[in-house]
Amino acid sequence: MKWLWVLGLVALSECLVKIPLMKIKSMRENLRESQVLKDYLEKYPRSRAHVLLEQRRNPAVTYEPMRNYLDLVYIGIISIGTPPQEFRVVLDTGSSVLWVPSIYCSSPACAHHKAFNPLRSSTFLVSGRPVNVAYGSGEMSGFLAYDTVRIGDLTVVAQAFGLSLEEPGIFMEYAVFDGILGLGYPNLGLQGITPVFDNLWLQGLIPQNLFAFYLSSKDEKGSMLMLGGVDPSYYHGELHWVPVSKPSYWQLAVDSISMNGEVIACDGGCQGIMDTGTSLLTGPRSSIVNIQNLIGAKASGDGEYFLKCDTINTLPDIVFTIGSVTYPVPASAYIRKDRSHNCRSNFEEGMDDPSDPEMWVLGDVFLRLYFTVFDRANNRIGLAPAA
């Protein structure tokens, strides 16, 4: 049995492609330094959980929350066109559309980012189909196009992507990325459009129909997206597999959330979404308020919760039980210290929806602790302690 396990690891790691991710200053810090954070949070109080509810109510519209990118610090580099034009993008498992700014974009936000020039690409094709992605702070509108997309050493031909003509105002002006590359299931995106990862598999560019994330908490470099395989040197022990409960988002069943052996949320089970496009741990408002009270976090006027920094050394782990396996999140992970040495809670309020089971979004706070494999071939998620 041991040899079968070793051979399985070899198969998973064969011919995989590693895409380095850059760790950067968060947009929240940019907004705070420009003294516009409070105004932004008051005007756009939407999180990924709000958008999940909106998308259920109107599945014909592609919704994306912009607030969930506020604390994002991981981006990757891709290129589009022939010769290649380079862009910094969020690699987002919570969406499935690829879009970047175009030179025809009239919004002030586009002036702060690299823009794709179709006239400089010999492989560019325009479809004429409009693209609209609704965000919490406005709407990205543009048009659909096709071109060669390169990610690492892999080249996808005739990839559909969106080119923006207008972008949401203040948020994208302060964004540290140019666009978004979605890694979610196809039904999250535009009807009839094949996402980038699906084309990597369909065009025979990767040996396994899966990808994995390793997010480093220490260095500017070291974080990694793995395409088509898994490198076991990035995690400890064995991967524990959990089935995807609803193949759209990378969604799974969570057994419970506990502290000091007592269930404090998700009593009787709930749903969780593994989301690289979300930085924090987001849950129903009632559950988050309870957790903030338990850890002694106090609300500020802008929706954030503050704690005394010395509590990092005294507060207990908060434990997520998934597939009967426990995944502790220590205080050093669920509390963050900013550049001004203020400490904030990494739990964020979503919303309560009486018509739906309790929904959580497990963002980078969780994913930094646990190496995560997204297995499309078997509709499952693998988790193991990160190395």
From Swiss-Prot:
Origin: domain of life: Eukaryota
Active-site residues, Swiss-Prot/TrEMBL: 92, 275
Domain Peptidase A1, residue spans: 74-384
GO process terms (BP): proteolysis
Ways its activity is controlled: Inhibited by pepstatin A.
Keywords of the record: Aspartyl protease, Disulfide bond, Hydrolase, Protease, Secreted, Signal, Zymogen
Disulfide bonds: 105-110, 266-270, 309-343
EC number: 3.4.23.1
Compartmental location: Secreted
Signal sequence, renumbered to the chain: 1-15
UniProt propeptide residues: 16-62
Tissue: Expressed in glandular chief cells of the neonatal stomach. Expressed in yolk sacs of the placenta (at protein level).
Top EC class, one word: hydrolase
Reaction(s) catalysed (UniProt annotation): Preferential cleavage: hydrophobic, preferably aromatic, residues in P1 and P1' positions. Cleaves 1-Phe-|-Val-2, 4-Gln-|-His-5, 13-Glu-|-Ala-14, 14-Ala-|-Leu-15, 15-Leu-|-Tyr-16, 16-Tyr-|-Leu-17, 23-Gly-|-Phe-24, 24-Phe-|-Phe-25 and 25-Phe-|-Tyr-26 bonds in the B chain of insulin
GO cellular component, one term: extracellular region
Record GO terms (molecular function): aspartic-type endopeptidase activity
Main location: secreted
Family: Belongs to the peptidase A1 family.
Function: Shows particularly broad specificity; although bonds involving phenylalanine and leucine are preferred, many others are also cleaved to some extent. May play a role as a specialized neonatal digestive enzyme.
Name of the protein described by the UniProt record: Pepsin A-5
Encoding gene (name): Pga5
